Amino acid sequence: MKYPFQCFLAKIILLALASSFVSCYDPSPLQDYCVAVPEKNGVFVNGEFCKDPKLVTSDDFFASGLNIPGNTNKRLGSFVNPANIPGLNTLGVGIARIDFAPGGLIPPHIHPRASEIILVIKGKLLVGFVSSNDYNYTLFSKILYPGDVFVHPIGLVQFHANIGKTNAVAIGAVGSQNPGYISVGDAVFGSKPPIDPKILAKAFALDINIVRYLRKVFSPQDDIVND
């Protein structure tokens, strides 16, 4: 045992490095649960005030209504109905029902804080995501039928589209109580204030008049940047 201290120190350093590689997108809870309440008379955790644990009931961990179809009479022909469960606060998960009219879709978008898993309940969906430039922007896509499941990694562009002739229903579960949602089209062509059309025209190899048109589609209330 010539260098016992050095060996011990090396183990500590390796343990610290290994711990630094572990990622946690939602903070680990410091208690069994923190049921969110609107009143400001409790303990403040993860952006919400916690209900007194002595007053927590089973209903705080319950939600109904995911059996009710959403209104898909919209431009994109889809509707997302997230389950509103106060007890989800600090638990790092979320769930929603997604309804699609024939031809309806959830456009290319990003969840910056969570991976997502899709379970098809009814209909026929085309789903997919695109890898980063590290993997040459590869498209991973599948056609899903009832009972099929597909996973979307965190932070990558993804989409869901109903390619069937009937309505479709899916359940989406995410690994965060607040996964975030960034629509690619809205972010690029509907930002506030708007991105200069010259920049977008050059970036996407588009005629500047097409950029102006897309700006009106994604943000009809805003004026175009003077060029």
UniProtKB/Swiss-Prot annotation:
Record keywords, A-Z: Apoplast, Disulfide bond, Glycoprotein, Manganese, Metal-binding, Secreted, Signal
Protein name: Germin-like protein subfamily 1 member 3
The keyword GTP-binding belongs to this UniProt entry's keyword annotation: no
Record-annotated disulphide pairs: 34-50
Record-linked Pfam families: Cupin_1
GO CC terms, sorted: apoplast
Originating species: Arabidopsis thaliana (Mouse-ear cress)
Localization per record: Secreted, Extracellular space, Apoplast
Domain Cupin type-1: 64-212
Superkingdom to which the source organism belongs: Eukaryota
Family the UniProt entry places it in: Belongs to the germin family.
Assembly and interaction partners: Oligomer (believed to be a pentamer but probably hexamer).
Signal peptide feature range: 1-24
Entries under SMART domains matching the protein: Cupin_1
GO function terms (MF aspect): manganese ion binding
